[in-house]
Amino acid sequence: MLGGGGVTGGVYEIGALRALDLLAVNRTVNQFDVYVGTSAGSFVASLAANGVTPEEMMRVVNQQVPTPFRDINMGTVLKPNYVDFAKALAVMPLRTVGVLRELASNVGNVGLMDLVFGLAEGLPSGMYSTEGTEKYLREVLGDPDRTNDFRSLENELYLTATDLDTCERIVLGAGDWDDVPISAAASASTSLPMIYKPVELKGRQLIDGGIRSTTNVDIAVEAGATFVVVVNPLVPYVNDFQKVIPTMLGSRVRRVADMGFPQIGYQSFKLLAHQRLHEAVRHWEEKYPGVDIILIEPDPNDELMFETHILDFNKRVDIARHGFESVTLKLAEDYERLREVCARHGIEVSATRVRKVVKRFEEERESTAAWRRILEQTTGALLRQSGQA
């Protein structure tokens, strides 16, 4: 199960999947029976369900040749919403005159926000369109070895979106929604409000699935899953007050409020999503008896995950490394329990080979290059180079 978090969250998930692939001796992350994706996780889940490995995804993200398909860039992810902007330019002059006339009759009782909300209906429904990512995913899944049809997959894939008008959770790939192309479903699931315009499918206006529910464990359980791995990149930052900023009188500790309104909004959104998730976590055991659930997420003191905005493409290697390290941290915290849980489901895991691979490459002088090799090379190649095969 893969949650949201924009480009940053998606790359974090690729790193986590890479570590899980290396950890499991007799399975790969492409052999799960059920994949559930929400927001950015829907993009990654769509590729994984189609057999694309984490290292192949990372090679594409890093634009490393050879790649299994065309690389992705910010021009694909951030395609301006030209249609809505054109409409706004056409109607805004008349809209402005009408709003000003209406407000003029009530001078003294109006403020700036009255003007903003008065003009809002003439503004675009989002700065960007998901048309670029939909087209890209459609091309990738159009390969003869892959499919853009939920019904043609060997495993099960479910992507969630939210109906903007009714507030319902829409499970794309299930019931009446299984005939929607996977690429269209993923574009709807990733339509973060105000950033991206809503996506219309079957007459419904759909937005980011993470708005309604963060991870959707119930979907996997209802599909018959008894072992569920949840990767959640959305964790609010817990300030340790170690960083300082200069002031006229010297310096003081840095606070989230110093980072501007985008980070304040992002922190608030992650806090709500994380609180909702962990409220659900507390009831997982009694709600889903007989189901083993493992949760993987960043450390709350992880400054890189917090400072990197959700559409930042430049820090992808570092973010993927953090995803990888979240899995190794999970190993360090409770390896015996993890090993026992995996064994119950016929999965053999080895912390030793993960440690040996990381140790082998961390000895190199250039850390970024070493981590790129860990993230981009096949498991077999890594094991051979670390003397384990």
PLM feature segments, named:
Residues 1-38, 43-389:
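Patatin-like phospholipase
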